[in-house]
Amino acid sequence: MELSGATMARGLAVLLVLFLHIKNLPAQAADTCPEVKVVGLEGSDKLTILRGCPGLPGAPGPKGEAGVIGERGERGLPGAPGKAGPVGPKGDRGEKGMRGEKGDAGQSQSCATGPRNCKDLLDRGYFLSGWHTIYLPDCRPLTVLCDMDTDGGGWTVFQRRMDGSVDFYRDWAAYKQGFGSQLGEFWLGNDNIHALTAQGSSELRVDLVDFEGNHQFAKYKSFKVADEAEKYKLVLGAFVGGSAGNSLTGHNNNFFSTKDQDNDVSSSNCAEKFQGAWWYADCHASNLNGLYLMGPHESYANGINWSAAKGYKYSYKVSEMKVRPA
């Protein structure tokens, strides 16, 4: 069927309107977007409707009800520890527990393996002079002064005079036990000296210093002191040498005497007469436990005397007697 000219003209008009509408859409979108309709076509033409732009959003609706609580999730990793809080108050003291059973007595490990003298300490690497603990043959611990510097070291000092701070004119009991101060003058005690020298052989060294600072010494090959039952008898070996000379050999095999126990061979009490305590014979050639008389003195033989060096009227400033295993 042929289309009439009028129909074709109307179709072209519709297309032209659509073209112009589409071309103007960007500009209209910037301002408004009115609804576009094409209606009223005559005859057999179909009705064509063009949809306009969306309208403005409406007002938000009311808030809905909360949903059902979901399942609990898995536990997360622990967080970093926080700062420590302030220290709380001290708690009450608890009740005292029950006393344990007494253990079996055993030998001290220190006694079994500990040092026996200062030479033993030196051999173990103790090179500093000073006070150390050693163990006597009966396992008694004893604190002694070790001379690690003189003549190769390893000397156990049992007598020291240095400043007159300690009274050496004492009785038998005091010399038996020992007396004095670690910081100054002392006598180690006849029981301890006996224990130190009873086992094996020990050499003796005597060191003397006068008030002019001159040093002298004397050495003996062996030295032992017997026990109290033998009145601490001196058993002395040969004089080896030394700048002080020999002032002790004459006391060999003599008993120890004090002002209250006269064991010498003199008709008088030498300890009382010369105000000391020593292995007096018919009195002495040395008196290192005599009075501290500050060098030259007018009195006779009652100072810290070593007659072979300075006679009987000079009292030494420093005296040390020491032993070492031979």
Swiss-Prot record:
It comes from the Eukaryota. Disulfide bonds join 111-139, 118-146, 270-283. Residues 1-29 form the signal peptide. It is a peripheral membrane protein. Residues 109-326 form the Fibrinogen C-terminal domain. GO terms for molecular function: antigen binding; carbohydrate binding; carbohydrate derivative binding; G protein-coupled receptor binding; metal ion binding; pattern recognition receptor activity; sialic acid binding; signaling receptor binding. InterPro entries: Collagen, Fibrinogen-like_C, Fibrinogen_a/b/g_C_1, Fibrinogen_a/b/g_C_dom, Fibrinogen_C-term_domain, Fibrinogen_CS. Gene3D superfamilies: Gamma Fibrinogen, chain A, domain 1. Residues 77-89 have a biased composition (Low complexity). It is found in: Secreted; Cell membrane. GO terms for biological process: cell surface pattern recognition receptor signaling pathway; complement activation, lectin pathway; G protein-coupled receptor signaling pathway; host-mediated suppression of symbiont invasion; positive regulation of interleukin-8 production; positive regulation of opsonization; protein localization to cell surface; proteolysis. Residues 55-93 form the Collagen-like domain. Residues 155-243 are annotated as: B domain. NCBIfam families: GGGWT_bact (NF040941). The fibrinogen C-terminal domain mediates calcium-dependent binding to carbohydrates and tethering to the cell surface in monocytes and granulocytes. The domain undergoes a conformational switch at pH under 6.2, and looses its carbohydrate-binding ability. Homotrimer. Interacts with elastin/ELN. Interacts (via Fibrinogen C-terminal domain) with FFAR2. Interacts with CRP; may regulate monocyte activation by FCN1. This is Ficolin-1. It comes from Homo sapiens (Human). The gene is FCN1.
